[in-house]
């Protein structure tokens, strides 16, 4: 496998002054996010991309459109690549949840893999949604591919490759506009990854 999978997190979004839970809430890129996407475009300008698999949330679509502007690359929107659904916690600040739902807040912190937000999904459920799609992308492409997704989605993919538990996946840093390169190591006979931007 000489091909590479470039796993990208979308550019920055504007969530206001307070840190909020944002999963499937459909927010556009901020001005800073657009600048980050333009830097990604420059990074990828000389890298051949066969296809792009993109979360249908607008922040990912915008990021992919900027990266691939004026390039004849097929873009495939995949609902399975959407961010974790945080249900009733969507758009609520961390401080609000901690204040009004202290038991749930504590429970999520202690059981991050299995905790399901009311009306949402757990990271374990997210992994079950994302990994089969990632495996299909990996097996069914012959050349370099781009995946534009979200911090949660990227972490479940990377933690799966690195054999890291969901409980420890937040140790994997996924800044806005970051790039992870996934490749096959012939010597070790396994899939590897590294953050390159």
Predicted regions and their residues:
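Extreme N-terminal starter segment of soluble prokaryotic enzymes
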Residues: 1-6, 51
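Short, well-ordered beta-to-alpha junction loops that form the rim of enzyme active sites
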Residues: 11, 55-57, 80, 148-152
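Loop-to-helix element that buttresses phosphate recognition and phosphoryl-transfer chemistry
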Residues: 9-62, 117-130
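Generic beta-sheet signal
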Residues: 5, 141-152
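Glycine-rich phosphate-binding loop signature in dinucleotide/nucleotide-binding domains
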Residues: 45-48, 137-144
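Phosphate-coordination/substrate-recognition cap region in phosphate-metabolizing enzymes
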Residues: 40-105
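Acidic, low-complexity terminal tails and accessory targeting/binding regions
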Residues: 1-3, 77, 84-99, 143, ...
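Internal catalytic-core helix/loop-beta-alpha segment
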Residues: 106, 110-138
């Amino acid at each position: 496998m000489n091909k590479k999978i470039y796993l990208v997190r979308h550019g920055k979004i504007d969530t206001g002054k307070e840190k909020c839970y944002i999963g499937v809430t459909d927010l556009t890129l901020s001005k800073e996010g657009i600048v980050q996407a333009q830097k990604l475009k420059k990074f990828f300008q000389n890298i051949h991309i066969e296809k792009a698999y993109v979360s249908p949330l607008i922040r990912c679509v915008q990021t992919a459109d900027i990266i691939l502007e004026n390039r004849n690359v097929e873009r495939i929107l995949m609902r399975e690549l959407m961010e974790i659904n945080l249900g009733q916690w969507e758009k609520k600040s961390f401080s609000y949840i901690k204040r009004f739902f202290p038991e749930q807040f504590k429970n999520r912190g202690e059981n991050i893999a299995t905790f399901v937000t009311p009306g949402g999904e757990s990271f374990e459920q997210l992994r079950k949604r994302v990994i089969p799609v990632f495996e299909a992308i990996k097996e069914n492409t012959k050349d370099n591919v781009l995946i534009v997704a979200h911090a949660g989605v990227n972490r479940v993919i990377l933690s799966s490759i690195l054999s890291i538990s969901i409980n420890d996946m937040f140790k994997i840093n996924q800044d806005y506009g970051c790039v992870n390169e996934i490749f096959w190591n012939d010597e070790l006979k396994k899939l590897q990854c590294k953050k390159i931007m």
